[in-house]
From Swiss-Prot:
PROSITE patterns according to UniProt: RIBOSOMAL_S8 (PS00053)
GO biological process: translation
Listed GO CC annotations: ribonucleoprotein complex; ribosome
Organism from which the protein derives: Aeromonas salmonicida (strain A449)
Record protein name field: Small ribosomal subunit protein uS8
Length: 130
């Protein structure tokens, strides 16, 4: 059986892993998943990530906790295969009043909403993280 939305699966694995206080979660790798993991690492939401394997690469994400609580409070898919959500620079959302980030896929790659605003670029809103 094929997976319909691999990005939603990735976000769910992160959410469930933190709810179960896991050290790390692993999943099948793709370029987009690695780009999202890179943004999450830069923003401090995960401790790290690594890709292992040649034939079927696996992405392993090391989860991050602060005083025993998960760093990620909210991780929510926005644009999905059945309903893509695109926003212009001026319409990019501020997650939790600027405390969280929206991960945006632009023509220059995957970046946060702040970086997209700074570069005056819109794009597809992949997910919200706070």
């Amino acid at each position: 059986m094929s997976m319909q939305d691999p990005i939603a699966d990735m976000l769910t694995r992160i959410r469930n892993g933190q709810a179960a206080s896991k050290v790390a979660v692993s999943m099948p790798s793709s370029k987009l998943k690695v780009a999202i993991a890179k943004v999450l690492k830069e923003e401090g939401y995960i401790a790290g990530y690594s890709v292992a394997g040649d034939v079927k690469p696996e992405l392993e994400i090391e989860l991050k906790y602060f005083q025993g609580k998960p760093v990620v409070e909210l991780i929510q898919r926005v644009s999905r295969p059945g309903l893509r959500i695109y926003k212009r620079t001026t319409d990019l959302p501020k997650v939790m009043g600027g405390l969280g980030v929206a991960i945006v896929s632009t023509s220059k790659g995957v970046m946060t909403d702040r970086a997209a605003r700074k570069a005056s670029m819109g794009g597809e809103i992949i997910c919200y993280v706070a």
